[in-house]
Amino acid sequence: MNDWTALTVTTTTEAIEAVSNILMEAGAVGIQIKDAADFQKETVDAHGTWFDPKTVPHLASGAQVIGYFDPATSLVEQRDHIATRVRGLAQFGLDPGAATVTLADVRQADWANVWKQYYHPLRVSRFLTIVPKWEHYTPQQAGELQLTLDPGMAFGTGTHPTTQLMLSLLESVIRGGETMIDVGTGSGILAIAAERLGVGDILATDVDEIAVRNAEANIKLNPVSHITVTANDLLKGITLSADLIVANILAEVLVPLIPQVRPRLKAHGHFLLAGIIADKATLIIRTLEDNGFSIAQRREAGGWVALDAVIKETA
């Protein structure tokens, strides 16, 4: 008997995280991402060599998101529904690409090794390098910080522009000792990075119980001890006040989150937002301004926007 059923969605780079979320909601116990954009150059900008893409099999264009399901899951019936949801991403400003959905059986041994073909140490910012848990890595410069992740567990593994934009913003605002709330933590990468950069106590939340367990597992792989992970719907019911609030989620979810942030953000704090496709940036900025925020920083990469918002100063 085969151990897993793999459901593959052919899509675009910009839709990867949204498609990953669709598959997790459908019951996927693991997500694999193949993105041609990760293999377009031999080096990662100014941060040094990553690896030579010619030595690794990869897609020539586009992206694939592969969800791994228990074989008892009735995917034949779900396949059309998943395809419809993926095509529906167009109404949110995301290009779903071909949006084709295929099924295949995969044995446990194959699944356990497949991540190692596509995931290698990746320098993602000035100080941060993401390393898969099976690889030994030696820092290349003083002050470099390693984030150890299991990429077979959830999306948010650092290869997507939204994650890298958020990590660079974190580096720019953290001074040390802050309190932070990470809304929609996913793999826990932002919370882990924040503590490694000097943040004190961190509350990481996600509406998905599977994501909560995945974040907890990734946290155990790193030298961090001040992160609490809990299942929660955005900031509903949370009374903690924080110096930093971060959210790397789709614009459609950021809109209802923004009014919840203002009462929870301390004076002179920072609200960092990512997951914003470029043509949704105006909507998000307007919503922020309507709720008493101003934009301190704006960063862009690969058609995505990240923002650093602060509470407007009163005269």
From Swiss-Prot:
Recorded name of the encoding gene: prmA
Family: Belongs to the methyltransferase superfamily. PrmA family.
Binding, S-adenosyl-L-methionine: T163, G184, D206, N248
Pfam families: PrmA
GO biological process, one term: methylation
Species whose genome carries this gene: Lacticaseibacillus casei (strain BL23) (Lactobacillus casei)
The protein's Enzyme Commission number: 2.1.1.-
Protein name: Ribosomal protein L11 methyltransferase
Function (record text): Methylates ribosomal protein L11.
InterPro entries in the record: Ribosomal_L11_MeTrfase_PrmA (IPR050078), Ribosomal_PrmA_MeTrfase (IPR004498), SAM-dependent_MTases_sf (IPR029063)
